[in-house]
């Protein structure tokens, strides 16, 4: 595997970091659905965060999108208490997603690292949804939302990231 080193000055990196983190909040706050769109864009940003966001801000990037989604529901009237139940697990799965990509890309191609990380994130969320469902805390629809949809939006987010990354690396 050929490795290419790209140098980014600190001012440019700070600019990109601010864009990624801001969009991580704004997209789920301003776009209330469908999950396929918002989830894909958020996953793309989480992946972009592995390249453009300082390590110390990964937790911020992992947390902001779900807070924005809750606020969107409160402000625009589509609030569901069920999302609140998932918040800590969404934060954990997003953080694990970011960190596993960073760890795995040292050992595998980025495409495989992202794919494996998507499945890990989806597993965490599906397992949480399954436990909540078994205890009758959430309706069955959350098994799909936190399972298959996570895989689909993660893969689609990865595809978009790879396209953007290819353009970025050519500049």
What is each PLM-predicted segment?
Residues 2-52, 56-57:
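Hydrophobic transmembrane alpha-helices
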Residues 18, 22-25, 44, 63, ...:
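Residue-level signature of the transmembrane alpha-helical core
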Residues 22-30, 65-76, 119-127:
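Aromatic-anchored segments of alpha-helical transmembrane domains
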Residues 29-38, 59-67, 91-105:
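Hydrophobic alpha-helical transmembrane segments
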Residues 33, 76-86, 93, 99, ...:
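Membrane-embedded alpha-helical hairpins and interfacial helices in multi-pass inner-membrane proteins
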Residues 34-49, 64-74, 145-146:
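Hydrophobic, membrane-facing alpha-helical anchors
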Residues 37-49, 88-96, 123:
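Membrane-embedded alpha-helical segments of multi-pass membrane proteins
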Residues 56-60, 112:
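Residue-level recognition of membrane-helix boundary sites in multi-pass small-molecule transporters
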């Amino acid at each position: 595997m050929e490795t290419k080193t790209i140098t980014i000055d600190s001012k440019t990196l700070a600019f990109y970091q601010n864009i990624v983190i801001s969009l991580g909040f704004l997209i789920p706050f301003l776009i209330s659905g469908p999950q396929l769109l918002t989830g894909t864009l958020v996953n793309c940003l989480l992946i972009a965060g592995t390249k453009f966001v300082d390590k110390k801000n990964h937790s911020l990037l992992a947390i902001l999108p779900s807070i924005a989604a809750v606020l969107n529901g409160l402000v625009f009237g589509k609030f569901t208490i069920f999302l609140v139940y998932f918040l800590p697990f969404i934060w954990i799965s997003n953080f694990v997603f970011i960190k596993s990509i960073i760890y795995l890309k040292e050992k595998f191609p980025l495409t495989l690292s992202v794919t494996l990380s998507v499945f890990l994130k989806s597993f965490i969320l599906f397992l949480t949804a399954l436990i909540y469902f078994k205890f009758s805390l959430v309706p069955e629809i959350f098994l799909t939302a936190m399972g298959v949809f996570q895989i689909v939006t993660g893969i689609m987010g990865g595809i978009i990231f790879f396209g953007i990354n290819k353009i970025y690396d050519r500049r």
